[in-house]
């Protein structure tokens, strides 16, 4: 069974995936390998619509394996991805209040996030997406006051993962 981590930017999807297993798949990293540039560069050159098409193709390929997948925050923007998430078991929604997520995003200087350049726009995006995340989740974890290790333990308990 695949475990798929979803949630808004800054929720800790990649961090948690790394702690769950060494052999996790970071969807954003796979996409960057496929497009041979950063996601930020791709957004600037081709826009979000073209990015979402590639994201869907890479996601569908990743779903064919029994792996841990850390998705990008916008995975739910494509209806095809929403359908795929809805039919998959093991979808974990990592959530927190917007201010907590914004603080994390703002402190993360290693990741350029094209859709997080403006706080108000990011908050609107957060509000737009949060219900879709919740609809497809088999497990929702509020990460606000939890360490990555505590989150991993909850996931392991839910599915009996060692």
Swiss-Prot record:
Cellular compartments annotated: Cytoplasm
Cofactor: Mg(2+)
Keyword set includes Hydrolase: no
Protein name: Shikimate kinase
Keywords, ordered alphabetically: Amino-acid biosynthesis, Aromatic amino acid biosynthesis, ATP-binding, Cytoplasm, Kinase, Magnesium, Metal-binding, Nucleotide-binding, Transferase
GO molecular function, one term: ATP binding
An annotated GO cellular component: cytosol
Co-factor binding details: Binds 1 Mg(2+) ion per subunit.
């Amino acid at each position: 069974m695949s475990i798929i981590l979803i949630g808004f930017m800054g929720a800790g999807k990649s961090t948690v995936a790394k702690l769950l297993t060494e052999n996790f798949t970071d969807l954003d990293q796979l996409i960057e390998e496929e497009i041979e540039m950063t996601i930020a560069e791709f957004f600037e050159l081709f826009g979000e619509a073209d990015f979402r098409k590639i994201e869907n193709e890479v996601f569908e390929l990743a779903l064919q394996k029994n792996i841990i997948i850390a998705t990008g925050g916008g995975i739910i923007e494509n209806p095809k991805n929403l359908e795929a998430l809805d039919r998959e078991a093991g979808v974990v929604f990592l959530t927190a209040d917007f201010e907590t997520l914004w603080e994390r995003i703002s402190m993360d200087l290693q990741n350029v996030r094209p859709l997080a350049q403006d706080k108000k726009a990011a908050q609107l995006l957060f509000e737009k997406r949060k219900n879709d995340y919740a609809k497809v989740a088999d497990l929702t974890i509020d990460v606000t006051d939890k360490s990555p290790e505590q989150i991993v333990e909850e996931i392991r308990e839910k599915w009996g993962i060692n």
